[in-house]
A protein has these predicted regions:
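Long, positively charged binding patches that form subdomain-scale interaction surfaces
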Residues: 310-385
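Catalytic nucleophile-His microenvironment captured as a short glycine-rich beta-strand/loop
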Residues: 92, 172, 378, 383-411
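Active-site nucleophile-adjacent alpha helix/oxyanion-hole segment immediately C-terminal to the catalytic cysteine
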Residues: 69-321, 325-337, 414-416, 424, ...
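N-terminal regions that are enriched for targeting/export leaders
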Residues: 26-82
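Short His-Asn-centered micro-motif
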Residues: 95, 339-342, 391
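Conserved catalytic-core surface of thiol
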Residues: 396-467
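Bacterial Sec-dependent N-terminal signal peptides
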Residues: 1-26
Length: 467
């Protein structure tokens, strides 16, 4: 047998072997027949099929037995204010951060319960700063190829209306605050999707232009910065047309909780912040539970910030049983906290109740859903999706938490009068972040923040903007 024939036969064997392997890996008629028989052999499946076809899955899976555990009493609760409404926007992080600040202002100055800081005011600056963050990041990475993972991530995520607490802190420090009636909501701030799409499209176009400009021989950094400034003029115009221009000065009348006028004065955003929200954000620490990473270490997420020269999200990773006492200490001292979780899991929308036993999917579908918290995060099945204000805890006779309550920003008609109640078991499984003031944190944890953080990439499974 000559070499050519031998090579041909070997090649044919490889092809046949690969074909056989691929066939075995696909769904064969025999396999499909076996799958179908396993379903059809159980008579109850037909009844379930008919029931699910005409109803919502959650209505069928709802555990009526578990509803007896629903309870709205709380042993420790921070006095609540009028519930806010972020409407059809992803600004939960902003509403939550400002709710923490307004709670302090209302208590200090005896303001009406419906007092609010303007969310759209800070959102205007947020979108301008995020646009600059994206454009400057494109300049910084201009020498990297287009398929570089960081460059790819930037173009996939040029801007969003989501965010987190360090964004609130940086924006308030830089731009101040105004009351809600000094800059009111618009259709575009309440429904952000259209403007977000337009702005994202323009930023991607600008990003490509900056990369092309930076690739040309002789282009200086000063030229890139000048062009970026011109691009931000366009961004500013888009924002101003959608939201209006932020006020540089305004007159506002302070009223007491009964609505009686107390004082009328002129303010700038900075002077209004200094009077009504004079807080030191450096005393606010981010605590997180990410069981897939080593505990008692500080982590930082690259590009997880709102302002280019601001702060990335930086947190101390702790076990859940060590986070709860920090939150309890804060609530006992009438201090609300920025809190975020995976809000959609096992949520009874009608009651505003979060309980891992709300829905019995295992009995309905005849299979267990057995991933733990670590596995859910690793496989992108769970993560921090929504920020709210942690305001209450119900403790048992041993001072251990039974359930928690958060003030939401979906309006007062959602859930329990605008609040959500969560069992401690749900809290442990789906709570991820809480921001605690230093006076409620033991010194041993504060010292851990002095260590150099472990830098994580922005595409880490744990991190996405809270909406």
């Amino acid at each position: 047998m000559n070499i050519f024939k031998l090579a041909t036969m070997l090649l044919l064997c490889v092809v046949i072997s690969c074909s056989t392997t691929l066939s075995a890996q696909g769904i064969s008629p025999e396999m499909l027949n076996s799958i179908q028989k396993s379903y059809q052999s159980n008579p109850s499946n037909k009844a379930l099929q008919n029931a699910i076809a005409g109803s919502d899955i959650n209505k069928i899976a709802l555990s009526h037995e578990n509803e007896a555990n629903y309870d709205t009493y709380f042993s420790n609760r921070v006095p609540s204010q009028a519930v806010t409404d972020q409407k059809s926007s992803g600004r939960c992080w902003l509403f939550t951060g400002l709710n923490v600040l307004r709670s302090k202002a209302i208590a200090k100055y005896d303001l009406p319960a419906d007092f609010q800081f303007s969310q759209v005011y800070l959102f205007f600056w947020d979108q301008l700063e995020k646009s600059n963050l994206f454009l400057q990041a494109i300049i910084d990475t201009r020498k990297q190829p287009m398929d570089d993972k960081t460059v790819e991530w930037l173009f996939k995520n040029p801007i969003s209306d989501g965010g987190q607490f360090t964004g609130v802190a940086n924006l308030v420090d830089k731009y101040g605050l105004v009351p809600a009636d000094a800059m009111t909501e618009t259709n575009s701030s309440n429904k952000t999707s259209t403007m977000a799409s337009i702005l994202s499209l323009k930023l991607r176009e600008f990003g490509l232009e900056l990369r092309e400009m930076g690739a040309k021989k002789g282009t200086t950094d000063a030229q890139l910065q000048q062009r970026k400034a011109e691009m931000l003029q366009v961004v500013y115009k888009i924002l101003a047309l959608n939201f209006g221009e932020p006020p540089a000065e305004f007159t506002w009348t302070q009223r007491d909780k009964s609505g009686k006028p107390v004082e009328t004065a002129k303010y700038t955003p900075a002077s209004f912040r200094d009077k009504y929200a004079n807080v030191d954000f450096s005393t606010y620490y981010m605590i997180m539970n990410d069981p897939g990473k080593e505990y008692y270490k500080v982590y930082e997420i690259e590009y997880d910030r709102h302002v280019y020269d601001g702060d990335n999200w930086k947190y101390l990773n702790l076990p859940m049983e060590e986070i709860a006492p920090l939150a309890i200490a804060s609530i006992k001292d009438s201090t609300m906290m920025y809190f975020s979780c995976d809000v959609g899991k096992f949520l009874n929308k009608d009651k505003g109740w979060l309980d891992v036993n709300n829905y019995d999917y295992a009995s309905l579908f005849g299979t267990e859903f057995g991933m733990n918290k670590t596995q859910r995060v690793q496989t992108f099945a769970s993560g921090s999706s929504h920020a709210m204000t942690l305001c209450a805890v119900d403790l048992d006779e041993n001072d251990q938490p039974k359930k928690w309550m958060v003030e939401n920003s979906w309006g007062s008609s959602y859930g329990y009068k605008g609040f959500l109640i969560m069992t401690n078991e749900w809290f442990n499984e789906y709570m991820f972040r809480v921001v605690v003031e230093s006076k409620y944190i033991p010194e041993k944890y504060l010292k851990m923040f002095e260590n150099k953080p472990v830098m994580l990439p922005p595409w880490d499974p744990m991190f996405s903007p809270e909406e």
